[in-house]
Amino acid sequence: MSGRERNGGRSAENNDKKERNERNGRNDRGGRNDRRNQQDERSQFIERVVTINRVSKVVKGGRRFSFTALVIVGDGQGMVGVGYGKAKEVPAAIQKGAEEARKNFFRVPMINGTITHPVQGEDAAGIVMMKPAAPGTGVIAGGAVRPVLECAGVQDILSKSLGSDNAINIVHATVAGLKQLVRPEEVAARRGKSLDEVAPAAMLRARAAGQGA
C-alpha cells in the first residue's frame, strides 16, 4: 500500500471519528462540550456579587477559614434570583452562589420598564420600599437594592431602604417585595372587575403597546 493510500485511509477514519464525536456531544480530544455549553448559558445572564465575607470555624486543630458570597443573577428581562455560596476559595463561592441563584429564579411583573404597583418588602430587620416611576427616571436605588433591580431588568423605579444596613437583609427584603407584585389581570380577577376599572390609563396604554414583562 502506498503512502498516499495510507494517508487517505487515516483522513477518512479521522472524519468518521469527528462525526461520531459531534453526534455524541464530544470534541476532537474526547471531552464533552458541556463546559462550553455551560459558559454560553452563563453569558446570557447578568451576575452581580453583592458581598464576599470570610468566615471561620473553630475545630480541634485550630480555625478553618472559608468564604461566603451573595450573588444575584438575572436575564435583564424580568427573571432574577438570589443565591448564597460558601467555599474555601472566593471563585468557588461565587460559582456556588450563582448556581443557587439560577435555581431560585422568579419573574418580576413589569409594565413599561417599571413595577406594576407600590410595594414594601421585609425580611429580618431589612425593610425596602419600592414605587413605580415614569419613563426616564432611572433606577433610584442604592446599596444592595440596585443590583437586584438591574439584574431583573427594571429601568425606572423609586426605592428606599428603611431598616437594617446589612446587605443580606436588604437583598432578601427587596426580593420579598418583588415577589409580592401582581399583574393587573390578577387583581381584576380577584376583585371581579374588568381590567379598565383596576389599572390606570397609562398602564393600559403601555400594555397595549407591548411594553409589559
Curated annotation (Swiss-Prot):
<dbReference type="GO" id="GO:0015935">
    <property type="term" value="C:small ribosomal subunit"/>
</dbReference>
<keyword id="KW-0689">Ribosomal protein</keyword>
<keyword id="KW-0694">RNA-binding</keyword>
<protein>
    <recommendedName>
        <fullName>Small ribosomal subunit protein uS5</fullName>
    </recommendedName>
</protein>
<dbReference type="GO" id="GO:0019843">
    <property type="term" value="F:rRNA binding"/>
</dbReference>
<dbReference type="InterPro" id="IPR005324">
    <property type="entry name" value="Ribosomal_uS5_C"/>
</dbReference>
<dbReference type="InterPro" id="IPR014721">
    <property type="entry name" value="Ribsml_uS5_D2-typ_fold_subgr"/>
</dbReference>
<dbReference type="Pfam" id="PF03719">
    <property type="entry name" value="Ribosomal_S5_C"/>
</dbReference>
<comment type="function">
    <text>Located at the back of the 30S subunit body where it stabilizes the conformation of the head with respect to the body.</text>
</comment>
<dbReference type="InterPro" id="IPR000851">
    <property type="entry name" value="Ribosomal_uS5"/>
</dbReference>
<feature type="domain" description="S5 DRBM">
    <location>
        <begin position="45"/>
        <end position="108"/>
    </location>
</feature>
<comment type="function">
    <text>With S4 and S12 plays an important role in translational accuracy.</text>
</comment>
<dbReference type="GO" id="GO:0003735">
    <property type="term" value="F:structural constituent of ribosome"/>
</dbReference>
<feature type="region of interest" description="Disordered">
    <location>
        <begin position="1"/>
        <end position="41"/>
    </location>
</feature>
<dbReference type="InterPro" id="IPR013810">
    <property type="entry name" value="Ribosomal_uS5_N"/>
</dbReference>
<dbReference type="GO" id="GO:0006412">
    <property type="term" value="P:translation"/>
</dbReference>
<dbReference type="Pfam" id="PF00333">
    <property type="entry name" value="Ribosomal_S5"/>
</dbReference>
<comment type="subunit">
    <text>Part of the 30S ribosomal subunit. Contacts proteins S4 and S8.</text>
</comment>
<dbReference type="InterPro" id="IPR018192">
    <property type="entry name" value="Ribosomal_uS5_N_CS"/>
</dbReference>
<comment type="similarity">
    <text>Belongs to the universal ribosomal protein uS5 family.</text>
</comment>
<keyword id="KW-0699">rRNA-binding</keyword>
<dbReference type="InterPro" id="IPR005712">
    <property type="entry name" value="Ribosomal_uS5_bac-type"/>
</dbReference>
<keyword id="KW-0687">Ribonucleoprotein</keyword>
<dbReference type="InterPro" id="IPR020568">
    <property type="entry name" value="Ribosomal_Su5_D2-typ_SF"/>
</dbReference>
